[in-house]
C-alpha cells in the first residue's frame, strides 16, 4: 500500500519542526511549504529548507507573497517595534490573516498532489493570543476546504492536522526530543539576526526559553 501524501507548513521554528517529525513518524510522504511573506526574520527560511531536507521531506517549496504590503504587524512593518512583553491583548506581532493565507496555499498544493492531509504547527496553549491559532479556526478552515475544492465536492475531504494544538511548549519539546529533533537548528525569534541568533526578549523567545526550562531540557538556542 502506498503511503499517504501530506503538505506540511514549515516555518523553520520549533513547533513546525516538531509537526514535520510527527508527520514523518506517521509515515506520510511529506511535501513542505514555507513562505517569504515580508517578515523581518527571513533567516528562518534557511532553517525551514534545512529542516525539510534533514527530516526527509520529498519536496520543499518556498512561496513569496507580500503580506507586508498591508502593514499592520510588527513582523512585516519595520516602523513598528517588536514588543518585549505581552500586553494581554492581541499583540502587534499578529499578521492579519496569515494562517488563512498559508493554509489556502497549502490546500491548493494538496489538491494538486492528491493529498488529503495538511499539517500546521498552531498552538492554543502557549501562544500569544493570535485568533488564527484557535481550535475553532482550524475546524472552520477544514469545513471551508470541503466546500471550496473539487476534491471536497467529490467526497475526498481534507484533514487539517494540528497535533500541537492542545500541548504546552514543554510538552511539544519533550515530544520533539523523543522524535530526535535537533532544536539548535530551528529559529523561533521574531527578530533573529542574519546568523540566526535570537534576541531572547520577544514573545516567541520567552515562550521558547520557558518551554525548555519547564521540559527540563537544556536550551540550545543561540542568542545575540
UniProtKB/Swiss-Prot annotation:
Pathway named in the protein's UniProt entry: Purine metabolism; 7-cyano-7-deazaguanine biosynthesis
EC number(s) stated in the UniProt entry for this protein: 6.3.4.20
GO annotation terms (biological process): queuosine biosynthetic process
Co-factor(s): Zn(2+)
Binding-site residues for ATP, renumbered to this chain: 10-20
Pfam families according to UniProt: QueC
GO molecular function, one term: ligase activity, forming carbon-nitrogen bonds
Catalyses which reaction(s): 7-carboxy-7-deazaguanine + NH4(+) + ATP = 7-cyano-7-deazaguanine + ADP + phosphate + H2O + H(+)
InterPro entries in alphabetical order: QueC (IPR018317), Rossmann-like_a/b/a_fold (IPR014729)
Keywords attached to this entry: ATP-binding, Ligase, Metal-binding, Nucleotide-binding, Queuosine biosynthesis, Zinc
Binding site for Zn(2+): 189, 199, 202, 205
Enzyme class: ligase
Cofactor notes: Binds 1 zinc ion per subunit.
Domain of life of the source: Bacteria
UniProt keyword Ligase, yes or no: yes
CDD domains: QueC-like (cd01995)
NCBIfam families, alphabetized: 7-cyano-7-deazaguanine synthase QueC
Function: Catalyzes the ATP-dependent conversion of 7-carboxy-7-deazaguanine (CDG) to 7-cyano-7-deazaguanine (preQ(0)).
HAMAP family: QueC
Family per similarity comment: Belongs to the QueC family.
Protein name: 7-cyano-7-deazaguanine synthase
Gene name per UniProt: queC
Amino acid at each position: 500500500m502506498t503511503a499517504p501524501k501530506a503538505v506540511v507548513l514549515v516555518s523553520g521554528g520549533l513547533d513546525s519542526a516538531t509537526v514535520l517529525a510527527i508527520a514523518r513518524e506517521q509515515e506520510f510522504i511529506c511535501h513542505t511549504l514555507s513562505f517569504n511573506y515580508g517578515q523581518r526574520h527571513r533567516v528562518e527560511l534557511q532553517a525551514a529548507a534545512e529542516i525539510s531536507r534533514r527530516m526527509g521531506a520529498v519536496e520543499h517549496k518556498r512561496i513569496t507573497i507580500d503580506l507586508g504590503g498591508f502593514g499592520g504587524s510588527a513582523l512585516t512593518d519595520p516602523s513598528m517595534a517588536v514588543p518585549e512583553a505581552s500586553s494581554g491583548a492581541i499583540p502587534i506581532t499578529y499578521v492579519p490573516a496569515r494562517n488563512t493565507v498559508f493554509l489556502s496555499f497549502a490546500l491548493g498544493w494538496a489538491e494538486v498532489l492528491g493529498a488529503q492531509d495538511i499539517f500546521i504547527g498552531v498552538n492554543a496553549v502557549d501562544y500569544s493570543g493570535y485568533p488564527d491559532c484557535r481550535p475553532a479556526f482550524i475546524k472552520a478552515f477544514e469545513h471551508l476546504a470541503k466546500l471550496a475544492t473539487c476534491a471536497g465536492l467529490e467526497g475526498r475531504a481534507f484533514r487539517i492536522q494540528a497535533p500541537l494544538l492542545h500541548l504546552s511548549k514543554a510538552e511539544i519539546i519533550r515530544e520533539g526530543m523523543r522524535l530526535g529533533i535537533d532544536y539548535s537548528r530551528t529559529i523561533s525569534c521574531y527578530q533573529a539576526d542574519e546568523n540566526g541568533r535570537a534576541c531572547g526578549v520577544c514573545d516567541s523567545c520567552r515562550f521558547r526559553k520557558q518551554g525548555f526550562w519547564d521540559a527540563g531540557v537544556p536550551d540550545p538556542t543561540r542568542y545575540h
